[in-house]
A protein has these predicted regions:
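Anaerobic metallocofactor- and corrinoid-dependent redox/one-carbon enzyme cores
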Residues: 2-471
Length: 471
């Protein structure tokens, strides 16, 4: 015992970081081990986890989750076309505005979403200017609904209106379809809350030139295998949420023969190619629709604890669970932590927003950051942290997708099928990398970073699942 006190002190601190912080101030070597008790100490959650682990319920959950995992992995999404939302999106009307995240009223919409809504109303000709659009949005005459409830996903504000052209992605394995609108690229754009005349002019051009060209090109091409293209893009250094250099190159390569043969004037062809070349984000929405098509195939499986939706609207974060179809489990939207563009401060940023977390729900984006170490230049952190995120996410998922792999981790399949019981039991929250929109309407993107869902979403989902299935 006496020799113990004559040796250098090396401390491992488990849990509360204040103890390790105090030791560091005294120049004592200390290793901080992040740990939280199951359920983050909530005994109701711990009790629910114990109840769900009892037979025969645990066996039913395991069988349901095996099926959900299989459906995600076996899903084979392909791009089959483009068309206007009014023609293809279930439930779309001329006075419907779809938005990102769980349901939200006009009064509770954040600045970026309100900016996008008013811009869309002007674009659709439903309002003569932004002031008129604000009055219309508040009047009750416009139907607001989540994209996810219409087989859609929407980037950032996610605002989708009748005239906008949509990707049409079909799951060849199960037959379901998913939709998302086109990338406006990375300038002052509607999805970030900008809504001045330059934004409206771009939307008009996308409706009148870009959309029809893509539609007619796909009539010639037939279909594009998105699952194969995704796997290639990850092997080329993308994570296919915020880094899309390879994916956009592959997508425009596949589209080019059809675009050239579609019969449009050379001047318009040049406009389209210059537009695509202006930003690597052109393929970003494509991956979102691909992931949505795969995850919807796993939604609605009785007894399954698999997360099929993670989405944010700048006000709340929402989850949907396979075994509890039609229900949202929400918590407060979080602050995104990451580098800001020059001239902006963290206090300028809006809260977490967008349906693009469907990529992480599928297993790419933040879950696949080990494929894209260069992403840290945009979202912050280190290469080592990016790699660790991919390893850590495997702890809260049911398996790996062998169709989409991570070369740096010995070609491990992407972590697939987030399980609410694993999240609740471990305290490990899904990691999401995302853009940051300004808190006020009319400005746009001001940075990017890392964010996690609030634990309360998983807590609510778990307790509701227990109440539904534990008899």
């Amino acid at each position: 015992m006496t020799t113990l006190f004559n040796q250098p002190l090396n401390v491992i601190n488990v849990g509360i970081a204040m103890f390790s912080d105090d030791l560091k101030k005294q120049h004592v070597p200390v290793t901080q081990l992040d740990w939280t008790p199951p359920g983050q100490g909530n005994m109701q959650v711990v009790e629910a986890l114990d109840q769900l682990a009892e037979k025969p319920l645990a066996e039913k959950i395991a069988a349901a989750n095996k099926l959900a995992l299989e459906r995600i992995i076996q899903s084979h999404p392909v791009l089959v076309g483009y068309d206007q939302a009014i023609n293809v999106v279930p439930g779309m009307t001329r006075t419907t505005i779809l938005h990102a995240g769980p349901p939200v009223s006009w009064e509770n919409m954040c600045g970026a979403m309100k900016g996008a809504v008013t811009g869309a109303l002007v674009f659709e000709g439903l309002a003569k200017d932004l002031d008129d659009a604000t009055r219309l949005a508040a009047s009750g005459d416009i139907t607001f609904s989540p994209c996810h409830e219409h087989d859609c996903v929407g980037s950032m504000a996610g605002v989708t209106s009748a005239s906008m052209f949509m990707h049409i992605v079909e799951n060849k394995t199960y037959g379901n379809r998913a939709f998302t609108n086109l990338s406006e690229q990375m300038a002052k754009i509607l999805r970030m809350g900008a809504n001045d005349q330059s934004v409206i002019d771009r939307l008009n051009w996308m409706r009148d030139v870009l959309g029809p060209m893509l539609r007619d090109a796909m009539k010639i091409i037939g279909e594009i295998d998105l699952r194969l293209m995704l796997a290639q893009a990850l092997h080329m250094g993308d994570e296919c949420h915020n880094r899309n250099n390879a994916g956009t190159t592959l997508l425009i390569q596949a589209l080019t023969p059809g675009l050239i043969q579609a019969g449009y004037p050379v001047a318009q062809q040049r406009e389209v190619f210059e537009f695509v070349a202006s930003s690597d984000y052109f393929s970003g929405p494509t991956w979102m629709a691909m992931c949505k098509a795969a995850l919807d195939a796993a939604h609605g499986i009785e007894y399954s604890t698999v997360v099929t939706t993670m989405a944010r609207n700048g006000y709340e974060f929402g989850l949907r669970i396979s075994g509890l179809p039609g229900q949202w489990f929400t918590g407060p939207a979080q602050q995104v932590i990451g580098p800001m563009f020059a001239g902006y401060k963290p206090e300028d940023s809006g809260l977490d927003i967008g349906d693009s977390a469907i990529t992480e729900t599928y297993g790419i984006g933040g879950f696949a950051m080990a494929t894209a170490p260069a992403i840290v230049a945009l979202v912050g952190g280190t290469v080592e942290e990016a790699i660790d995120f991919s390893r850590q996410m495997r702890e809260i998922t049911l398996g790996e997708n062998p169709n989409v792999t991570i070369p740096l981790l010995s070609f491990m399949g992407i972590p697939t099928a987030i399980d609410i019981t694993r999240v609740a039991g471990s305290g490990i929250l899904p990691v999401i990398n995302t853009a940051i929109a300004h808190k006020d309407a009319g400005i746009g993107m001001i940075g990017a970073g890392i964010v996690h869902p609030p634990f309360s979403c998983f807590e609510k989902a778990l307790l509701t699942f227990r109440d539904r299935y534990f008899l």
